[in-house]
Each structure stands twice: as structure tokens, then as C-alpha cells.
Curated annotation (Swiss-Prot):
Species per Swiss-Prot/TrEMBL record: Anaplasma marginale (strain Florida)
GO molecular function: ATP binding; metal ion binding; pantothenate kinase activity
Cytoplasm among keywords: yes
Enzyme class: transferase
A single GO cellular-component term on record: cytoplasm
PANTHER family: TYPE III PANTOTHENATE KINASE (PTHR34265:SF1)
EC number: 2.7.1.33
Function text: Catalyzes the phosphorylation of pantothenate (Pan), the first step in CoA biosynthesis.
Protein name per UniProt: Type III pantothenate kinase
Family affiliation: Belongs to the type III pantothenate kinase family.
Biological process terms in GO annotation: coenzyme A biosynthetic process
Pathway: Cofactor biosynthesis; coenzyme A biosynthesis; CoA from (R)-pantothenate: step 1/5
């Protein structure tokens, strides 16, 4: 059993994987003050709902993190409670899969490395646009030869929600959720509709502009926490909420020879 951990700015995804298949998964809030013992307690409670001894089968772990302050706590979690040294995803792991970062600043987040590894494994001969809808929404352009040659970085849906909460005194707190129509007659519903349709319009607009500017025929892949808002979108060829987790597992297996 492999534990794949994706530490994002807003939430941390944890998945138990066996033979490349996700057996169970959980999402908890990302907190720099959470100790290794607290992580273990949290995971133990969540895992026990499936099986009392499921964690006994853990033989390895891999971590994608964009929150450095969390790294030591998660590393200690596995060293102290599982007696294993976890693999931290870095840009160098892209080389193992023939991927090249051809950007002016050739350093990207570990989650993006995992996304690109997983996407390229499934579509090895395609030019790809891989969209990760996390705290930030990142559009990755990967050519069929494995070169990451372009990117767009925009706000994520959680950033938009947070901004509305922080920058307005009288508007009610709300979440982004699907809305059938954009024009509403209540403040709460109007906020939800504005967040939902506004975010969708941003992603669709950027995607279509990328495709207009591109000389390649792009296969569009979407993942991340915000991807649940994008069902039935004809410009997204494939939606995979587990793309990052799959990439983390693939990188772990590759490093083990």
C-alpha cells in the first residue's frame, strides 16, 4: 500500500493506493501548525472507517507539497509512525519521464510535475493543455515531445471566495456551487451564481484564447479541487480529479526502480 499526499495551499489530499488504484482518499485542511502526531491521529480515524488495520499494509509514501512549512511535519509522520522515508516530488522527477521544463524560470510546483507525469502517461503522443484548478488555476501547455513550453496562472475558485469574504463587510459568506441560472433574486443566490458563472467564464475564456493562439491541436485535461464545477463542458476533453494523486504514485514507483 502506498500513501500519496498532495499538500496544497488550501487543502491536503491523502490517498491510499494499491497496484496503481486508489483504495480510499480524504481531504483535510492544510495547516502549518498540525504536528506529525495530529496528522497520524487524523489519518487513523479516517482510515478506520474502511478497515481497522488498513494502515498496517503501508510500505511507502510520496508527497507533493507547495507549502514548505508543512513538509517537516508530514515527513515526521511517515518516519515516526510508519518507519519509512517518504519521497518528496521535485522538478528533477520530471526527467525520469522524459519531461522538460522549457520556461523562462524552469521551476514549477510539485503538484504540476505530478499532473504532467500522469497526463503524459495516458496521452503520450498528444499535445496537452493540463488545467489544475486549485487555490490558483494553472494552465500547463505540454507538447507531444514532453516539453512544458507555456503556462497561464489565474485565481482559483477558493481565492475568489476568500476575496469576497475578506473585501466585503455586508455580503453574506457563501461557497461556490453549481447554479442553473446567473440572474437571481436573493443576495446569497446572486453571490453563488456570480462565483460559479464568473469562474467558469474565466476558465473557458482562457482555454479558448489559448486554443486560438496555439498552432497545435490540444487535448484539454482538467483536475483539481475546483473541477467539480465543470461537468458537461464541451471544451474539456477529460476530467480526472485524481490526476495529481496518480502522478504522485507513478513517480514513487519509478523511484523504486
Amino acid at each position: 500500500m502506498i500513501v500519496a499526499v498532495d499538500v496544497g495551499n488550501t487543502s491536503t489530499k491523502i490517498a491510499l493506493c494499491e497496484n496503481g488504484t486508489v483504495v480510499d482518499k480524504w481531504r483535510i485542511s492544510t495547516c502549518g501548525k498540525r504536528t506529525a502526531a495530529e496528522y497520524f491521529s487524523c489519518i487513523s480515524v479516517l482510515a478506520s472507517r474502511r478497515s481497522a488495520d488498513i494502515l498496517a499494509g503501508v510500505r511507502g509514501a510520496a508527497i507533493s507539497s507547495v507549502v514548505p512549512v508543512v513538509n517537516r511535519h508530514v515527513e515526521e509522520l511517515f518516519e515516526r509512525f510508519f518507519n519509512i522515508s517518504p519521497v518528496f516530488i521535485t522538478n528533477s522527477h520530471a526527467d525520469l519521464f522524459g519531461l522538460k521544463i522549457c520556461l523562462a524560470q524552469p521551476t514549477i510546483g510539485a503538484d504540476r510535475v505530478a499532473d504532467l507525469v500522469a497526463a503524459k502517461t495516458v496521452w503520450p503522443t498528444s499535445d496537452l493543455l493540463v488545467i489544475d484548478m486549485g487555490t490558483a488555476t494553472v494552465f500547463n501547455l505540454l507538447d507531444r515531445n514532453g516539453g512544458l513550453y507555456g503556462q497561464v496562472v489565474a485565481p482559483g475558485v477558493s481565492c475568489l471566495v476568500h476575496s469576497m469574504r475578506e473585501c466585503t463587510a455586508l455580503l453574506p459568506q457563501t461557497l461556490a456551487r453549481e447554479s442553473e441560472k446567473i440572474v437571481c433574486d436573493s443576495t446569497a443566490a446572486s453571490l453563488e451564481a456570480g462565483l460559479y458563472w464568473g469562474y467558469r467564464a474565466m476558465v473557458e475564456g482562457i482555454t479558448k484564447q489559448i486554443m486560438r493562439e496555439s498552432t497545435r491541436t490540444l487535448r484539454v485535461i482538467a483536475t483539481g479541487g475546483g473541477v467539480g464545477l465543470f461537468r458537461n463542458c464541451d471544451y474539456l476533453n477529460h476530467i480526472d480529479e485524481l490526476l495529481t494523486i496518480k502522478g504522485i504514485v507513478q513517480i514513487y514507483e519509478k523511484t523504486q526502480g
